[in-house]
Amino acid sequence: MNLMRTAMLLAFMTALFMGVGYLIGGQSGMMIAFVAAAGMNFFSYWNSDRMVLSTYGAQEVDERSAPEFYGIVRDLARNAGLPMPKVYLYDNPQPNAFATGRNPQNAAVAASTGLLHALTPQEVAGVMAHELAHVQNRDTLTMTITATLAGAISMLGNFAFFFGGRRDNNNPLGAIGVLAAMIVAPLAAMLVQMAISRTREYSADRRGAEICGNPLWLASALGKIARGAAHIPNEEAEGHPATAHMFIINPLSGARMDNLFSTHPDTENRIAALHEMAQYGGGTGPSVGTPTRSGSTGPAMTANPERKSRSVPNTGRGGSQPPKGPWS
């Protein structure tokens, strides 16, 4: 189903490029747009995950630079029966996380330093289990390509503005065609994001609860992340709104028009579904354990709302120690 959805998105992207190219430059513009779309589709499949990670300045971590966080992801991947993904951290105070990659063998999960500061290890486990559920459900290819293509579509309006007014462009509809391209392209970018069904978040919540072993860990994390996202801006996401659907919670501020086309279901509804799952005994699989120095899995983490993850690399904000881990 996800492969079919991805193919449909790629076809839509190509058709949109060709349509706007025709409005701007007639048949020659349409052919140029077709070649550009084909190249972009190929590039997106192989490189869109790297582009997203680079956009947020994510840096890969391992057992030495972020031992507890890395250990949590390792144990969760084992619980899910997945290959070990690459693990990334990006320096941002807003608590959030996302997954990317074209398949489980080439997957990556990323969390913000704000997430590790704000959440307990149990809540971090719930969040990363949700992201691994996206990997297991093969949502990541669709999500990552959509982020790249939606950003490209939004640029078509500017393309129409700068090149649509030339007299030698064979535009069959004149100024009307250019105006239509300027209006339709940004709207289509939003619709592409909405093409990723909201139900994938509910599915990832349920599977994530099964992977980590406790739906309430994820429910608690969602509440904290939503409150943090509402008050702490994410400047990178604000500058690249096409990537918003990749995050566990919409990272855009509530004042943005983009939220009229939200790609996420209501957080309270997601939390309620997880509480209902816990009430009926769902998600009672193996709990993620605390990694020991030998690399084996110790006892399951005990819930302690006051405890913060020890995996947070010191970024030097408010601390006397120099930066550690990926920021050393």
Swiss-Prot record:
Compartment(s) of residence: Cell inner membrane
Binding site for Zn(2+): 130, 134, 201
CDD domains hit by this protein: M48B_HtpX_like
Chain segments annotated as transmembrane: 6-26, 28-48, 145-165, 172-192
Top-rank taxon, per record: Bacteria
Pfam families the UniProt entry points to: Peptidase_M48
Cofactor note text: Binds 1 zinc ion per subunit.
Cofactor: Zn(2+)
GO molecular function annotations of the record: metalloendopeptidase activity; zinc ion binding
Spans annotated as Disordered: 279-328
Keyword Transmembrane helix appears in the UniProt entry: yes
Disulfide bonds listed in the record: none
Statement: the UniProt record of this protein carries the keyword RNA-binding: no
Biased amino acid composition, Low complexity: 287-299
Gene3D superfamilies: Metalloproteases ('zincins'), catalytic domain (3.30.2010.10)
Database matches in InterPro entries: HtpX_protease (IPR050083), Pept_M48_protease_HtpX (IPR022919), Peptidase_M48 (IPR001915)
Family per record: Belongs to the peptidase M48B family.
Record protein name field: Protease HtpX homolog
The organism of origin for this protein: Rhizobium rhizogenes (strain K84 / ATCC BAA-868) (Agrobacterium radiobacter)
Organism lineage string: Bacteria, Pseudomonadati, Pseudomonadota, Alphaproteobacteria, Hyphomicrobiales
